[in-house]
């Protein structure tokens, strides 16, 4: 049997995980600056949670969800997106309670699963940063979260990221727009794709999100939601735009944007990058004020986004941004002879307890081969430990680049290596 990873998945080897760790560290710092707290939810949940949250007519439910019946007869689905799980956790753990400070600001970094045709930047197991802000409705909340995504792109050095903005209005506005859209699309019903014909009367806004060529041509001239906003929705959107302008965050209005999920209302947005001549969405989200209540929680306004990490890395590579920090090792211990093995183990642990990054040889190779390994690992200092060093307790600590060396004792290293480290680097500091 040939063992290989499932189609649409990827192995992240050490060279790649170093990039991921760098991005995750930057993201964690940005989210912390905005006072968001990390949440971790199960990788699988009840199928109904996702089907109800994302919409029965959405592509996620009809085409992409990984679902199965477990041994207890429960209908389970692998998580296709993070918002539904965060909302479920918010309700189940009573984060809506009056003693909990509002808004509740949550972020996560998690794998998601969708059965899609694998291609560049789109895998069946992919990873997202997600943020959810629950408990307050204010245009400033929307803009703060959009600004947070913008800050993350800037701190990562990603350029050419453009903000696309729209509003879906409140329930009253959407109802008026829904009817206008049905009236417009009905004469074209026979020209629409099969999926769009099915969605026409169930959820006509989904037609605007279609990627089929025949649908794109028809919706190009469809009425815009902006023409059907009531005064409340219009005023809300105007304030969102004014706040973005106050922060010097440029945006364009895309009146056909609806996002791929059914739970959005009012502000929605996407951050888009031109990638090989095509527009690639790297981050998207919006307001979802009815979702908590839809799942029998209290009425709770909310706003959030998801950001694809694989796509972020793909864009960074295209823009020649190096996310791999230079790997260095403080100390490499070259070991010669069986009698030095025990002392090398003790020495390595002692140095690590003193907060130095250490590697040692385990193969009892010739010194030349060990020194080459130290070079490959980027070791700053080398300690050679043989049977003579163990017997006398005298050792030499050598700088791998300058070749400067200091003679000392094993006991001194165990007691405190920092002064020895500083002595070797004294000439560089001066």
From Swiss-Prot:
It comes from the Bacteria. This is Histidine--tRNA ligase. PANTHER family: HISTIDINE--TRNA LIGASE, MITOCHONDRIAL-RELATED, HISTIDYL-TRNA SYNTHETASE. It holds the Pfam family tRNA-synt_His. Keywords: Aminoacyl-tRNA synthetase, ATP-binding, Cytoplasm, Ligase, Nucleotide-binding, Protein biosynthesis. GO terms for molecular function: ATP binding; catalytic activity, acting on a protein; histidine-tRNA ligase activity; transferase activity. It catalyses: tRNA(His) + L-histidine + ATP = L-histidyl-tRNA(His) + AMP + diphosphate + H(+). Its main location: cytoplasm. It comes from Lactococcus lactis subsp. cremoris (strain MG1363).
